[in-house]
Structure formats: structure tokens, C-alpha cells
């Protein structure tokens, strides 16, 4: 509803038949008052929402009421001090721990009833129902992976639970246990780690991490903004050509593979990392790293000199790395261990460079590796939106194959961001590349014209991922001596044709599932490859 004379919106509601998950009804009401100069100031705001998990069931009615008072346009020392801070939202330390008496005395609208201020009571009542209680627990473990050691202010989280049981060709069955501390134990000092054991190779692996935060944290170490110094040591297996960006390699949902997972060696790595994030969206990381890669019977290191192959058990690099990132107005969903982007409306720029010198701190090779990337979401009004990710990189020196650029292959049947669903691990070797990942979400633009599909609220997806790469002669063991021979017979350098795969999919199946069917368009004559396949993932959206 809009006042004609004042030309301002007073209230707004969503149609009941809108293609929106979980929300059956929504009403927004706002009241304004005029300042002395005629400016309209928001005085009162009320948002009413009725949530429903499924049709035909009772929903949850929620109402949020906010009142705004004490506007002032007179400059004050307190205001100058507040606006000088870089934070967009300033939250006092004690804001979340005020007693009930404080709010009773200071809440500006006495008309707010007890029912409108009883979220805690509502949640307690809901958790009294076994279905809701166990659904909340299961979803929490699925999406965060961690179990708190207590209901209130847990000192320690156990997990990730979805990485407890896994396996691969080198290790056989693998068990893993770990956890991390929280700010309730110490708001500045955080610990994290795990221990794992493979029953086939009978080797113990693990990670130990200690991080000092210069900023006081509320719950977790990775809360924005991060300003920390982290010491980390890890000894584990290296799954060549596989790098899962938003989940652990031990995730049980990745256990079922479309091909044998046998491109695996070992590594030991010590890192010291300084991280600083700014409210402007700019951040940087400085890392000093000592890494040793060890061969295995699956991935032998055989140094080639003419026709002679000499076994090498391991090699080491001592490197420094600088990462720059600029993501203005970025929004993300934060879990205990990771961040998942929820808004890519503003572009995200990344730039990194890694450098190592032969003989410096025991490094066996000179190594320079540069990476750059940009990602952006483009909206097309009622026609949906497109997420675009572009990346490029180059290795500048002559190095063995583990230090080359291996495209990120996804061997599981799940949908994984920035990976190739039909490429085999170590299928291609490059020392320079350019890649793209384009996904078009139509938001029901086509399906909404079909009555049954509109009722199901299914939504269409079209995707295209590709990579153009090149391997120079100096890094090709077939053309240059002193390198490790490629351990996999099917490994090749890319030709002039880029690798391309496309997919069509449906999301919002049962409101939580996404299904894609993917086709491989190029290099279809390669032995042992999948030319097409069905992929699935959990994808909850409104």
C-alpha cells in the first residue's frame, strides 16, 4: 500500500502463490515520522511471517517488532567516535547479555506483549516435540558437522562427524576423530585438530592447529573479521587432483566414487599464517610453509634422465605465499569451520603468489606459482541469475608434476563447486590455465508455466564448466630430463581444445535436493572416462 501524496510505502505483503520456500505468508508494515527538515524517519516496523515446512501442516507464526527512537542530527563527540570506526554495525560487548530488567525499563514500546517477546519459550516448546528435536539435531550435524559438548556455551566441539568414517585405495578403511575449542574456553586462543588411522597402510595421520586471535571472538575462531596468527602441522594423505573447497575430503557423502580413488601419496606440512581481514572487504594472508611430499606404491616418484628412471622417496619445498582478496559487501553463511557465500552481487577478486628458492631452507626446487580469480553474480530480473567464476594461473619454473597445476576433479556423485564432475584425477597436467564456471539459475521461469511443476516449486539450472590449459616443454617429462615421470599412463597435456562439460538440473526437489545431469563435450576419446552422469547435492534455498 502506498500513500499517493507522500509517495512512500507503508506496508507490503507477498502473494500466497509466490514460488518461495517455507514462507506461506509475509507482511511488512512501517510507520514514519517527519523530522524538522521534512525528512521521513522510520519510527516503527513490524514483520509478520507464517512458516510452513510442508503443505497441509500447521505452520509457525513469527512476528518481529522494532521501534526507532532518539534520532539526532546534532554532532556529538560520541557520534564522531562511533562513525570513525570501520564497522558498519557497532555492537556493544554486553548487548547480548542484558538482564530482563534492563529491557523492561528501556524498551520504548510498552505495547509489546509477553507473547511477542517469547522466542526462547517458543523454541523450548518446539524442542519438546521429538520430531522437531531430532530433525534440528540431524540437520545441525549435516550442515555444520560438529556436536557441542554442552547445550550452553560449549568449550569444545567434536567433529566433523561426517568425516569419522571414510576410505580409499591406499589406506583402506579410515577412521578419524577430532574437534576444536571455542571462544567460551578462551576468546583469543583456539585449538583444532584430528587424528586418523588407515587400516590398510597402518599409518597414523593427524593435524594440530593453534591460532591466536588479536580480536576477541564471541564463539568461533573464523568469525569475521579475522586478525590472527596460526601455527599448523599436518601429516596425511594427498589425493592428487582432488581438492574439495567446501567440505572435508573425508566426508562420508564423498565415499561412493565413480572411479577408483588410487591417485594418492603422503605429505607432511608445517605452516605459519598471518591473516588480516578488513571491513572494506579487503583481506590478505602471509604464509611461511615447509612441505614434504612422499611417494607411495600408487604414486611413485621416478626421476627421468634419458631412459633411466631413478626412484625418489620424497622431496621438500620451503615456500612463502601471499594471498590478496577483495570482496566488498560480501555476505556469507558461517559455520564452525567454514564460510559459504550467500550473495555474490558484488564481485570478488583474488590474487596469490607462492615462491620457493632451491637451497633456501632446504628446498629442493625453485618454484613460482601465480593465481588470479574473479567471481560475480548477474541478475536478470524475473529470468533468474547467473553465477560466474573465472580463474587463471601459471607456474613459472621447471618443477616435478606434483607442483604443476592439476584441474580439480570431483570423483564423487555429489555436486561440488569449482570442480569437474566428469574429469578423472590427474587426467591433465598444466603449468598455465584459464577456467570458467558458469551456472544459470532460472528460478522457475520455465517450470512456473507448467501447473504441476509450479505446484512442486521445482526450479531449473543450466551450467557450463571448462578449462583451457597448456603444458610447456620444460615441464613435460617426455620432452625434458630431470623431471618425475607421470605415474599414470592416461595423464596427458591438453591440446588446443579446452575441456568442457555442461549440465542441466533441477533444484528445490523436496525443498532441499538438487539433481544435475552432466555431459562431457570434449576429450571424449580418453580411456576410462565417464561421458555423462547424474549428480546430486543438498541445496536448501528460499
Identify what each model region corresponds to.
Residues 1-9:
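Single conserved hydrophobic/aromatic residue that forms the stacking wall/gate
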Residues 2, 69, 130-134:
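Compositionally biased, intrinsically disordered low-complexity regions enriched in proline and serine
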Residues 11-75:
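Acidic, serine/threonine-rich low-complexity disordered tracts
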Residues 9, 85-542:
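Exposed, low-structure sequence patches enriched in small/polar residues
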Residues 67-91:
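Cleavable N-terminal export/targeting peptides
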Amino acid at each position: 500500500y502506498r500513500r499517493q501524496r507522500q509517495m512512500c510505502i507503508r506496508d507490503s505483503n507477498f502473494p500466497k502463490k509466490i514460488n518461495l520456500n517455507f514462507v506461506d505468508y509475509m507482511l511488512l508494515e512501517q510507520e514514519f515520522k517527519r523530522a524538522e527538515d521534512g525528512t521521513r524517519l522510520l519510527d516503527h516496523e513490524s514483520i509478520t511471517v507464517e512458516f510452513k515446512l510442508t503443505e497441509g501442516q500447521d505452520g509457525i507464526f513469527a512476528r518481529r517488532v522494532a521501534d526507532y527512537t532518539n534520532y539526532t542530527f546534532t554532532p556529538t563527540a560520541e557520534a564522531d567516535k562511533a562513525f570513525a570506526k570501520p564497522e558498519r554495525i557497532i555492537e556493544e560487548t554486553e548487548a547480548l547479555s542484558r538482564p530482563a530488567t534492563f529491557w523492561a525499563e528501556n524498551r520504548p514500546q510498552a505495547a509489546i506483549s509477553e507473547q511477542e517477546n517469547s522466542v526462547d519459550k517458543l523454541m523450548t516448546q518446539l524442542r519438546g516435540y521429538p520430531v522437531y528435536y531430532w530433525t534440528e539435531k540431524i540437520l545441525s550435524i549435516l550442515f555444520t558437522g560438529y556436536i557441542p559438548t554442552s547445550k550452553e556455551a560449549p568449550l569444545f566441539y567434536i567433529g566433523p562427524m561426517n568425516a569419522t568414517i571414510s576410505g580409499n585405495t591406499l589406506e583402506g578403511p579410515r577412521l578419524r576423530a577430532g574437534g576444536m575449542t571455542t571462544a567460551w574456553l578462551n576468546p583469543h586462543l583456539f585449538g583444532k585438530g584430528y587424528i586418523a588411522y588407515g587400516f590398510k597402510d597402518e599409518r597414523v595421520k593427524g593435524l594440530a592447529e593453534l591460532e591466536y586471535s588479536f580480536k576477541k571472538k564471541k564463539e568461533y575462531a573464523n568469525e569475521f573479521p579475522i586478525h590472527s596468527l596460526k601455527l599448523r602441522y599436518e601429516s596425511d594423505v594427498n589425493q592428487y587432483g582432488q581438492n574439495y573447497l567446501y567440505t572435508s575430503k573425508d566426508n562420508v557423502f564423498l565415499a561412493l566414487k565413480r572411479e577408483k580413488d588410487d591417485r594418492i601419496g603422503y605429505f607432511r606440512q608445517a605452516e605459519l599464517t598471518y591473516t588480516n581481514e578488513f571491513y572494506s572487504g579487503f583481506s590478505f594472508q602471509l604464509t611461511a610453509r615447509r612441505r614434504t611430499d612422499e611417494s607411495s606404491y600408487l604414486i611413485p616418484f621416478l626421476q627421468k634422465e634419458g631412459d633411466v628412471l631413478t626412484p625418489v622417496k620424497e622431496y621438500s619445498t620451503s615456500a612463502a605465499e601471499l594471498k590478496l582478496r577483495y570482496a566488498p559487501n560480501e555476505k556469507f553463511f558461517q559455520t564452525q569451520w567454514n564460510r559459504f557465500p550467500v550473495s555474490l552481487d558484488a564481485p570478488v577478486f583474488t590474487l596469490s603468489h607462492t615462491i620457493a628458492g632451491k637451497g633456501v631452507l632446504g628446498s629442493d626446487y625453485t618454484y613460482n606459482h601465480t593465481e588470479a580469480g574473479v567471481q560475480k553474480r548477474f541478475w536478470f530480473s524475473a529470468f533468474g541469475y547467473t553465477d560466474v567464476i573465472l580463474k587463471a594461473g601459471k607456474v613459472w619454473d621447471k618443477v616435478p608434476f606434483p607442483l604443476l597445476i592439476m584441474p580439480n576433479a570431483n570423483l564423487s556423485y555429489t555436486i561440488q563447486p569449482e570442480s569437474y564432475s566428469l574429469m578423472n584425477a590427474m587426467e591433465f597436467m598444466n603449468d598455465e590455465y584459464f577456467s570458467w564456471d558458469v551456472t544459470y539459475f532460472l528460478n522457475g521461469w520455465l517450470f512456473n508455466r507448467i501447473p504441476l511443476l509450479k505446484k512442486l516449486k521445482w526450479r531449473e539450472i543450466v551450467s557450463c564448466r571448462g578449462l583451457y590449459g597448456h603444458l610447456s616443454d620444460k615441464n613435460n617429462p617426455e620432452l625434458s630430463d630431470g623431471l618425475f615421470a607421470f605415474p599414470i599412463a592416461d595423464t596427458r597435456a591438453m591440446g588446443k581444445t579446452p575441456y568442457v562439460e555442461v549440465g542441466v538440473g533441477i533444484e528445490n526437489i523436496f525443498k532441499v535436493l538438487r539433481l544435475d545431469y552432466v555431459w562431457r563435450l570434449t576429450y571424449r576419446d580418453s580411456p576410462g572416462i565417464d561421458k555423462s552422469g547424474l549428480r546430486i547435492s543438498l541445496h536448501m534455498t528460499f
